[in-house]
Structures are given as C-alpha cells and as structure tokens.
Amino acid sequence: MRNALIYPILTEKATRMTEVQTQYTFKVNPRANKLEIRKAVEEKFNVDVDSVRTVICRGKRKRQFTRKGLIEGKKSNWKKAIVTLKDGATIDFYGATASAGQANG
C-alpha cells in the first residue's frame, strides 16, 4: 500500500516512549496492515523494525451551539501504530534521517 504512514505523533507520551524504549508512534492509513507499516518505516527511515502494534482510536462526538440551534457531528476514527526498533536504531524526525549508532546528545 502506498502512503501507509501519514505523520509521526510527537506528544509528551510518545516522546517519553522514544527516549526510554525506542518506540515511535505514527498516524497511519486505516487500511494499512502491520506488514505494510513495517515496510514503510524500514524504507523511509532505513532502520530495522522489531515489532509493530496498532490501535484504532475512536472519533469523538462534537457539539456546537449556534444561533440556528445545536449542530452535532463526529470526527472520523483513525489508526495509530507504535513501532519498536531493534537495539541501537533511532529516527530523527526533525532532520528526516536515521542512524544505526548512538543517539546524538
């Protein structure tokens, strides 16, 4: 599948997982499976992937009060992938490069 990865998720929790366990979190195409996600990460960042876990996050219901009354809607469901890299591999999202050695810092 083309375009399995949509963008990396860079929240506080995801950053903590990256620093401690070399796990990276991505928003992915809802139709992508684990093998496609693994191949996309390996090709894009040139790293070895140890495992891939996926979660389907439910879309939230939204309400807005307007002059015409209550407008209700729902955000779409989306899929998140947590990718664990093999020992020693890292991804630099800001430079879009990967290194197999030690992390800079």
Swiss-Prot record:
- Tell me the Gene Ontology biological-process terms attached to this UniProt entry: translation
InterPro entries named among the record's database cross-references: Nucleotide-bd_a/b_plait_sf, Ribosomal_uL23-like, Ribosomal_uL23/eL15/eS24_sf
A molecular function annotated in GO for this UniProt entry is: rRNA binding
Cross-referenced Pfam families, in alphabetical order?
A: Ribosomal_L23
Q: Specify the domain of life of the species encoding this protein.
A: Bacteria
Q: Name one GO cellular component term.
A: ribonucleoprotein complex
Name the keywords, alphabetized. Answer: Ribonucleoprotein, Ribosomal protein, RNA-binding, rRNA-binding
**Description of how the protein assembles with itself and partners:** Part of the 50S ribosomal subunit. Contacts protein L29, and trigger factor when it is bound to the ribosome.
Give the protein's function.
Answer: One of the early assembly proteins it binds 23S rRNA. One of the proteins that surrounds the polypeptide exit tunnel on the outside of the ribosome. Forms the main docking site for trigger factor binding to the ribosome.
Task: Extract the NCBIfam families matched here.
Answer: PRK05738.1-3, PRK05738.2-4
Entry similarity comment: Belongs to the universal ribosomal protein uL23 family.
Spell out the protein name for this chain.
Answer: Large ribosomal subunit protein uL23
- Organism, per UniProt? Chloroherpeton thalassium (strain ATCC 35110 / GB-78)
